[in-house]
């Protein structure tokens, strides 16, 4: 979604053992969804053939982030061959970064990772809703989004948002600051989706791991 291409010549099937390559100029800054464009597209997205492209502004006027994280929301369809279930929106779970309660030790006692920051730090979240069907009402429980940028473009700024809706195939950038120690739970406020897996806990503590939210740890594995 970050590129301006030709849907006929630049999209198509890649056969086993085949490689295709193209380049493009990123004309707009922001956070962008990318995904498999071959038919059946919905099934390929439901199988996880997607990701995020972050295009930083040339002259960044936004406040500097102290930590950065990537969260991608998607739905889990138990049978990857059941295309009708995808058409009927019959998912079993909604996930962040490919895991059910992946960063939520409250709902999954086996979870060993969560997001970390220190009180007062500006935490920037690059968020993509991969879908393929559900909207996300992206919300930080016990917090307020200090700033939100629609599609991640710095010209599309909103301030003091309790939640913000991101449709399937869309993205946004969110800044969160906690003035005190404690936890926020980042969720989609579509609660059926949240309570089946789309919750990520961010712990604000004075002894937060300095590596978290930097380098390879912007995508917590």
Task: Identify what each model region corresponds to.
Residues 1-221:
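Copper-binding active sites and cupredoxin-like electron-transfer domains
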């Amino acid at each position: 979604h970050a590129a301006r291409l030709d849907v006929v010549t630049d999209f198509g099937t890649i056969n086993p053992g085949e490689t295709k390559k193209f380049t493009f100029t990123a004309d707009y800054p922001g956070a962008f969804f990318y995904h498999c464009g071959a038919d059946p597209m919905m099934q390929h997205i439901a199988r996880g053939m997607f990701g995020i492209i972050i295009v930083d502004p040339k002259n960044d006027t936004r406040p500097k982030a102290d930590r950065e994280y990537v969260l991608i929301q998607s739905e889990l369809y138990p049978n990857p061959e059941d295309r009708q279930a995808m058409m009927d929106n019959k998912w079993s779970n909604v996930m962040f970064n490919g895991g059910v309660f992946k960063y939520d030790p409250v709902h999954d006692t086996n979870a060993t990772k969560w997001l970390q920051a220190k009180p007062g730090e500006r935490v920037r979240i690059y968020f993509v809703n991969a879908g393929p069907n559900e909207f996300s009402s992206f919300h930080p429980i016990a917090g307020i989004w200090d700033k939100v940028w629609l599609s991640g473009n710095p010209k599309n700024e909103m301030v003091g948002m309790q939640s913000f809706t991101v449709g399937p195939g869309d993205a946004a950038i969110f800044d969160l600051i906690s003035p005190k120690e404690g936890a926020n739970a980042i969720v989609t406020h579509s609660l059926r989706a949240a309570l089946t897996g789309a919750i990520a806990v961010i712990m604000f503590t004075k002894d937060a791991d300095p590596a978290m939210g930097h380098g390879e740890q912007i995508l917590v594995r």
